[in-house]
């Protein structure tokens, strides 16, 4: 039986920052290989990752671009030697992602004739300010106009057949380099996957498919009024320790951006016995009065 792989990459984090990602994978019954590429990370952190059952690959940053984009260089250089070793590959952001189930189960049942799966953020590009402006800035208005009616796809969760994921990471690195915006990977991902042949190779997973959810658009309370009128599906909900799709009541395989919801963050802090620091849900001192509405 072919093996599957979950692989991540991060820079400048300590172990606590990635512990929820690591622990959730270990608790998901995933039976494949687990790899973390680490940059500017202490020996102690690398040791703890190794002790948790992950292969650790320390790398040195080239220091010329944001890690959002640089990670794809390291992912490609690892995967290009493994194209025939793995069946499915899943690569995600590390700091704000947890797995609720083994991704192998969903992929084996749902990928079918497709080579890749991309997770929808349940909103059209033209209705989400950051993605709209980011795509225009990086790729111009003509390409933006070509894809603006499509839903936003999240580059923080990439999965599919090994060769397809490998070559996609190479394309994302090249398309993200030397762009006008300092974060260009999401724009590159949304442009690329709407073009041939990627548009034929990629399954777009909606919330009702229970593959992955991205909480920043759907569930961040401070932006309910901004995004609410434009959501293409109902907001996911939290029940019995799991984030679920409203329509099907099925738990998602992957939860992304859980730190945008204070109650979810608090739950995962207790579950994984770690302090989760987030700019989106900072600690609130009850003795300090604030007019801020984004906490």
Where are these regions (language model features)?
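Preference for well-ordered, secondary-structure-rich cores of eukaryotic proteins
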Residues: 28, 32-35, 112, 188-190, ...
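Juxtamembrane luminal stem/stalk of type II transmembrane Golgi/ER carbohydrate-processing enzymes
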Residues: 1-6, 263, 270-295
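Short, flexible, basic/aromatic active-site loop/helix in glycosyltransferases
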Residues: 133-149
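N-terminal anchoring/stem segment of glycosyltransferases
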Residues: 1-87, 163, 291-295
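Short acidic, S/G/P-rich loop/turn micro-motifs used as interaction or catalytic elements
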Residues: 12-16, 97, 262
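Catalytic core and acceptor-binding pocket of nucleotide-sugar-dependent glycosyltransferases
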Residues: 147-267
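GT-A fold catalytic core of metal-dependent nucleotide-sugar glycosyltransferases
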Residues: 74-131, 166
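Short coil/turn segments at secondary-structure boundaries
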Residues: 19-22, 48-50, 61, 103-105, ...
């Amino acid at each position: 039986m072919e093996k599957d792989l979950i692989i991540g990459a991060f820079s400048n984090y300590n172990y606590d920052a990635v512990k929820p990602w690591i622990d959730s994978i270990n608790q998901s019954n995933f039976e494949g290989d687990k790899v973390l590429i680490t940059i500017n990370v202490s020996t102690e952190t690398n040791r703890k990752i190794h002790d948790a059952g992950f292969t650790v690959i320390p790398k040195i940053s080239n220091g010329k671009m944001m890690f959002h984009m640089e990670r794809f260089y390291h992912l490609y250089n690892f995967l290009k030697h493994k194209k025939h070793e793995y069946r499915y590959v899943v690569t995600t952001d590390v700091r704000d992602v947890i797995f609720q189930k083994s991704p192998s189960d969903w992929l084996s049942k749902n990928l079918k004739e497709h080579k890749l799966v991309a997770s929808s953020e349940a909103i059209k590009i033209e209705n989400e300010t950051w993605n709209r402006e980011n795509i225009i800035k990086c790729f111009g208005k003509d390409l933006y106009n070509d894809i603006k009616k499509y839903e936003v796809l999240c580059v923080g969760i990439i999965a599919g057949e090994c060769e397809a994921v490998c070559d996609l990471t190479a394309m994302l690195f090249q398309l993200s380099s030397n762009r006008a915006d300092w974060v260009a990977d999401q724009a590159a991902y949304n442009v690329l996957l709407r073009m041939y042949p990627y548009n034929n190779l990629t399954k777009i997973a909606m919330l009702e498919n229970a593959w992955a959810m991205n909480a920043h658009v759907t569930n961040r309370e401070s932006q309910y009024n901004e995004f609410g009128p434009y959501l293409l599906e109902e907001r996911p909900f939290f029940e019995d320790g799991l984030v679920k799709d409203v329509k099907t009541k099925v738990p998602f395989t992957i939860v992304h951006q859980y730190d945008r919801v204070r109650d979810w963050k608090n739950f995962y802090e207790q579950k994984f016995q770690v302090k989760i620091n987030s700019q989106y849900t900072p600690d609130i001192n009850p003795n300090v009065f604030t007019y801020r509405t984004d906490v």
